[in-house]
Amino acid sequence: MARTYEETIYDATVDAVNDALAQPVLPSPDEIKGNILDNSRNAVTMYNSIAQQGAKWKVPMELETYQIAYIMLHVHYIALIETTESEDDADCSLLGVYMEDGEDEGIYTTKDSEVRRIARLYKRRITYKEFQEMMYIMREEAPRVKRCSERNLIAVNNGIFDFDTKTLMPFTPDKVFTSKSRVDYNPNAKNVVIHNDEDGTDWDVESWMNTLSDDKGVVTILWQILGAIIRPNVSWNKACFMYSESGNNGKGTLCALMRQLVGEGRYASIPLKDFGKDFMLEPLIRATSVIVDENDVGTYIDKAANLKAVITGDTIQVNRKFKQPISFKFKGFMVQCLNEMPRVKDKSDSFYRRQLFIPFTKCFTGAERKYIKDDYLKRKEVVEYVMYKVLNMNYYEFDVPEVCKTALEEYKEFNDPVRQFMAEIMPELQWDFVPFTFLYDLYKEWYKKYVGKQEVKSLQVFIKDVLNLLKDYPDWDCPDSKKAVRPKNMMDKPEWLIDEYKLEDWYSTTYKGNDLKKSVVRR
């Protein structure tokens, strides 16, 4: 049976690639390219020797697109990396190439620029159209793989660290990582002391961490957070919110250390307000952490779904400019620095459970040492010790100190006026039965007094919010919010809040005297 030109060239490519892979040492790209062209030319010449005039084939002078795709798929480690746990749509997966050397050694890079760089080793002047065609071929034929999800395995700069056994293993294409820390794991790392001749001070990272808070529990959890940002396979299910209304408190310097641990290009800087915006989440694809040391004052988050999904590792849609959107599960940890607590529309307990507030109460104004951030935290021996310390700790959950729990409760009230209202008012109520209409009128006046503007929340929404929070007040219940209830004598006591908030509609309708005690009894 007569063979086509494409079939002949394909067979010549397969033979040359197989010969290359059989060699003790893989030939260079130029050698592989040359052997394929030689095989192809020989096959074409043989065909042309017996072909009739006008039916002869053109002798190839450079590789065809499908030949380059074949080389890429068989000489290099090319894989289609699934970005979610679903296997339904290969079009939403990322094409990655395993890097056997260079700064990305041991991980799969999904950058088109890196794939193009390798393709140009076989055809220097590959066109945009040819590159896109090659990518389509590889997407169809590349094996599909899953990102490594073993929570004990961590990709550091010089290998894969097993957190459980505390051992360093070599990289392998079978363990699919798309990112790694830029810091080596050094089992001999020590906490070095750095002396500054100019001001006569000595500095070491252990002592410096202790200066960030007088609360030992806070220092401990800060070390745990440093570890969390390089352990992306652990489902922490929380995001860290480092909070202080004043500057010069160490937050920014600590973030600089985090970035040194993760490495340039391996963290995303997405402020809270951008999680609901289009095209702002694409940096997550190649990141293992989100580190933001500045959020706008007065930030209001209307749509928190993406933020919650990123924190919990649920699937989100990532819209990419000029590319097809993909479904993506972010694996990593988030740190956001705040100078003011953000207001979020989502006031559910499921959202609050994801928040780890860490108050920074120290102030280093007048005692700043900029060289800590600009010099010390960039030194190899310093970051290698930090890496060594956090990888030799033993934890899969955070040890949350009381001060952080208190900060979260304060934030809940700050973010939710109804919660704050109930915390203040419920213990003060005198009546044993409180109509929702009374509580709503009281809330509106309280809101004007303490928030300073008119509340627009409707009665129905208010009732819903109250019922959601009522579980925090075991002395109160509401079996059926829609059922009419006769108060009988449950409203006979004086309700002093009527007078305090001047609820004119709730003063007694039968008593006309000046006795306050009688005027605030409902009749």
Where are these regions (language model features)?
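Short beta-strand segments and strand-loop junctions that repeat across beta-rich extracellular domains
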Residues: 91-108, 159-161
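Feature primarily recognizes SF3-like P-loop helicase cores of small DNA viruses
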Residues: 2-93, 121-523
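Trp- and S/T/G-rich repeat-edge/linker motifs of beta-rich repeat architectures
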Residues: 107-122
